[in-house]
Each structure stands twice: as C-alpha cells, then as structure tokens.
Amino acid sequence: MTQGAVKTTGKRSRAVSAKKKAILSAALDTFSQFGFHGTRLEQIAELAGVSKTNLLYYFPSKEALYIAVLRQILDIWLAPLKAFREDFAPLAAIKEYIRLKLEVSRDYPQASRLFCMEMLAGAPLLMDELTGDLKSLIDEKSALIAGWVKSGKLAPIDPQHLIFMIWASTQHYADFAPQVEAVTGATLRDEVFFNQTVENVQRIIIEGIRPR
C-alpha cells in the first residue's frame, strides 16, 4: 500500500469513527429524553447531522443503536470496577470507586437516567448483557471482596449488597437530579457540592465496612 493510500485509509477511518460517535451521542440525548418507543430514527439522524440512510449503514435498526448506547454506558460504569485487584488496599480502593462513580453521575447524567429507564422497563433489550458479562464481572469482584472480608480487611458484609449500595447512592444524584436540586439548590456540577457529596457518601459507606 502506498503512503497516499495509507493516509486516505486513516482519514476515512477517523471520519467513520467521528460519525459513529456523533450518532451515539445524539442517540443518548434522544433516547434519554423520549425513551426507546418514543424515539424516531429521524430525530437521531437530524441531531447527529446525518441522513437516516447513513445512520442505518452503521446501525441497522433502532434496537441495534439503542443496545449500542446501553453497552457504551455499561463500559463507562464498569471500567473502575474492572480495575479492582486483590493486592489493592480495600478501603482506599472502595473510596476511589465511589468517587469515580460520582464523577460518572456528574459527567454522564443522561446515560444514568437512560439505564434507569431500561431497568424500570424490565431490561428487555439488555438482559443478555446483565446475565452475561455483567454477572460474570460482579461474581469475580464479589469473590475478591469476600477475600478481603475473610482476611479481616473489611467488616463482615455481603459483597453484592455493598456493590448495590454504592451503585444506588452514587447513581441517585443523576437519576433523581431534579429532586436533589430542589432540596439542596445544587447539582453535581457545583464543585463544592460535588466534593461534599463524595466525602459524605465515602464516609457513610466506608465507616460501615471498616473492620472493628
């Protein structure tokens, strides 16, 4: 392949990647506002600045696009948990995980709300992911946390319930953002409130799992 051909291929690849990113971003905005059934592909295409035909070239159906958006959300959420290793200091690792999950709630509130909508609907389009890769990851990390408990590095708690509690307390600030703002007058976009939230959620959870 000539140097010119390589440059052309690289340019085309970047253009495709940018177009997919624009479509996924527009899909997240639209699905989180109108839900799966209330969203039309024409809306997403217009917001992404592409034709419907072009959109369908990359994502063959509304369902395929919706699932791609949800998988992207899961990848963002689960990355910090995937990084857990047995040699980590447990309390420090869990404190950092809480901070990272709150950063996700701050930076991707629409993603959190869309995922919540899918769960409330019974996860009809995401159940394979939940019972497959997600369950495998939770099983793996629960066993790791159970090892920390057994070695006395954490109080005797159930690992799955710990993970659920972290998810619930951190995602609340995105899923119920209007309620949080109505009560406190602030959102996670407020730096002072964000830091207070991190410190309080960390303290409440860490003090509950600290070995006595």
Curated annotation (Swiss-Prot):
The lineage of its organism: Bacteria, Pseudomonadati, Pseudomonadota, Gammaproteobacteria, Enterobacterales. The keyword Transcription applies. The keyword Transcription applies. This is HTH-type transcriptional regulator RutR. The gene is rutR. Master transcription regulator which represses the degradation of pyrimidines (rutABCDEFG) and purines (gcl operon) for maintenance of metabolic balance between pyrimidines and purines. It also regulates the synthesis of pyrimidine nucleotides and arginine from glutamine (carAB) and the supply of glutamate (gadABWX). One of its GO terms (molecular function) is DNA-binding transcription factor activity. It comes from Escherichia coli O157:H7. InterPro entries: Homeodomain-like_sf, HTH-type_TetR-like_transc_reg, HTH_TetR, Tet_transcr_reg_TetR-rel_C_sf, Tscrpt_reg_pyr_util_RutR, Tscrpt_reg_YcdC_C. PROSITE patterns: HTH_TETR_2. Residues 17-77 form the HTH tetR-type domain. GO terms for biological process: negative regulation of DNA-templated transcription. It holds the Pfam family TetR_C_3. Keywords: DNA-binding, Repressor, Transcription, Transcription regulation. Residues 39-58 bind DNA. Signal peptide: none annotated. Homodimer.
